[in-house]
Amino acid sequence: VVQNPETSSPGLAFLLATISHFGSEWVNFWKILNQNNVSVTSDWESSYYGNFIAGGGGNSIVVSYASSPIAELIYSDPPVEIPPTAIIEDSCFKQVEYAGILKNTKNKPEAEALIDFLLSQRFQEDIPLNMFMMPVLTEASLPVAFSIYPIIPSDLNLISPNEIESNRNNWTEIWTETVLR
């Protein structure tokens, strides 16, 4: 199960990973997936908790976050010793989420206070178990589960932000033509 890159950030990250990994052959990868009846959903939640076999669906592979194995270990009911998900390292793309202050905001002091709070060690140490993302502060302590299943693959697929900005619309249009039509 994959997510539509136009409506889902994990879907976009996976599309970008395939572009980085396969280069000019990325469209062929998607053609093959499509010929094998890949399921496409609009969002992560419906793919993971709906279509994926661990969520009761019929698909045995799902695009998800590198932190999914940790979340499964912590929240599965009934508990599991081995998560139903794994990381395929050469399929990973680094997804970064940002917070910023708008240039002409009328609430600059409040916006600065929010950014300061988001960057505080206390908040950063709450991120892993609440959002299953890595904190931005390197000095933030990680929960034990994050040492059992480390979530930072050693070989990430990367594309520069400028290249993404220049090509994103074209890439998603090609993807839509290849997979959805």
Residue ranges and their predicted role:
Residues 7-8, 20-26, 105-111:
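Short helix-loop capping/hinge motifs at secondary-structure junctions, enriched
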Residues 17-91:
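Ligand-binding pocket segment of bilobal, Venus flytrap-like solute-binding proteins
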Residues 144-181:
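Extracellular/periplasmic bilobal clamshell ligand-binding domains
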Residues 1-20:
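Short loop->beta-strand "edge-of-pocket" segments that line small-molecule binding or catalytic clefts
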Residues 19-23, 35-38, 53-58, 67, ...:
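Sec-exported extracytoplasmic/periplasmic mature domains
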Residues 16, 31, 46, 50, ...:
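Solvent-exposed, polar/charged alpha-helical surfaces in well-ordered, non-transmembrane soluble domains
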Residues 6-10, 67-70, 92, 106:
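Solvent-exposed loop/turn segments at secondary-structure junctions
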Residues 93, 99-158:
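Mature extracytoplasmic/periplasmic domains
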